[in-house]
Curated annotation (Swiss-Prot):
GO terms for molecular function: DNA binding; DNA-directed RNA polymerase activity; protein dimerization activity. The gene is rpoA. DNA-dependent RNA polymerase catalyzes the transcription of DNA into RNA using the four ribonucleoside triphosphates as substrates. Keywords: Chloroplast, DNA-directed RNA polymerase, Nucleotidyltransferase, Plastid, Transcription, Transferase. The keyword Chloroplast applies. It comes from Phaseolus angularis. CDD domains: RNAP_alpha_NTD. GO terms for biological process: DNA-templated transcription. Its EC number is 2.7.7.6. This is DNA-directed RNA polymerase subunit alpha. Residues 1-233 are annotated as: Alpha N-terminal domain (alpha-NTD).
């Protein structure tokens, strides 16, 4: 009995990518395995990771359209083969890749005749087109078509509102889901006297990220969900091992920078003009700060660690990571 417990406690779980391929610019496939698992664990992990992959991975898409030539959504435009509704559906399918936060503007300015494709969209620097050949409309006559677009990064699926906006813009259904499909299967086997399982996981993405990247983000999101339970245990039971942990005292980032003196070259750093996008923060930390409306280095430095720890999913270790990054990038010495 003791030997069985020892064998179980020393087993090492391992992920492995057993197949990866690009079927098209907008369809990536990956197949992964996780083993060895105890009986029942594969189904638990499979259900959880599938839900996270399909519902909580952030994506970027076009969410709103505006043009003077559009009287209403179900109208037609002279000189354009597609109806307005068909153009909206084509814009909905455009696959975008970005690390932006919130909403940004884009536009199309096209003079016919010719085919309007995704490459004709004028995008902000932080957004990329995955497939430039995606069709939008066929302009059959020498007419000008100007369209203003809103681009947003979010998660899940959002159905358009039925009412029109006062500025004449129209919502379109927003599918922020970069993961197209997820399947999992379980292979059971016997190892000695112990029943074990292998979890097989198949992931298809739209090309804005790879299946491996999607799996990493989903795993991190799942881990973050359980962090509060770990913190609660530390607070309520005051575990002995907590004495041996390296923890950071509560401080204001700005106070530390003042003590260490802001690094200067020829001019003092304009903290307001340094955005956290430039700091190369880990995606999870970056998203935590953005969701709390912390956009610049100055806004970050004016927060104490106590205030940052109130941010959902922000951990003590994240504060240390930020300080390390600021030191590496020489914002202070």
């Amino acid at each position: 009995m003791v030997q069985e417990k020892l064998r179980f406690s020393t087993r090492t779980l391992q992920w492995k990518c057993v197949e990866s391929r690009i079927e098209s610019k907008r369809l990536y496939y990956g197949r992964f395995i996780l083993s060895p698992l105890m009986k029942g664990q594969a189904d638990t992990i499979g259900i959880a990771i599938r839900r996270i992959l399909l519902g909580e991975i952030e994506g970027t898409c076009i969410t709103r359209v505006k043009s003077e030539k559009i009287p209403h959504e179900y109208s037609t435009i002279i000189g354009i083969e597609e109806s307005v509704h068909e153009i909206f559906m084509n814009l909905k399918e455009i696959v975008l890749k970005s690390n932006m936060y919130g909403t940004q503007d884009a536009s199309i300015s096209f003079k016919g005749p010719g085919y309007i494709t995704a490459q004709d969209i004028i995008l902000p620097p932080s957004v990329e087109i995955v497939d430039n050949r995606q069709h939008i409309a066929n302009v059959t006559e020498p007419v000008n078509l100007c369209i203003e677009l809103k681009i947003e990064r979010n998660r899940g699926y959002r159905i358009k509102t039925l009412k029109n906006f006062q500025d004449g813009s129209y919502d379109i259904d927003a599918r922020f889901m970069p993961v197209r499909n997820v399947n999992y299967s379980i292979h059971s086997y016997v190892n000695g006297n112990e029943k074990q399982e292998i979890l097989f996981l198949e992931i298809w993405t739209n090309g804005s990220l790879t299946p491996k990247e999607a799996l990493y983000e989903a795993s991190q999101n799942l881990i973050d969900l359980f962090i509060p339970f770990l913190h609660a245990e530390e607070e309520n039971f005051n575990l002995e091992k907590k004495k041996h942990k390296v923890t950071l005292p509560l401080f204001t980032f700005h106070d530390i920078l003042v003590k260490d003196k802001l690094r200067k070259n020829k001019k003092e750093i304009a903290l307001k003009s340094i955005f956290i996008d430039q700091l190369e923060l880990p995606p999870r930390i970056y998203n935590c700060l953005k969701r709390s409306n912390i956009h610049t280095l100055l806004e970050l430095l004016n927060n104490s660690q106590e205030x940052l720890l109130k941010i959902e999913h922000f951990r003590v270790e994240d504060g240390k990571s930020i300080l390390d990054i600021l030191k590496i990038q020489k914002y202070f010495t």
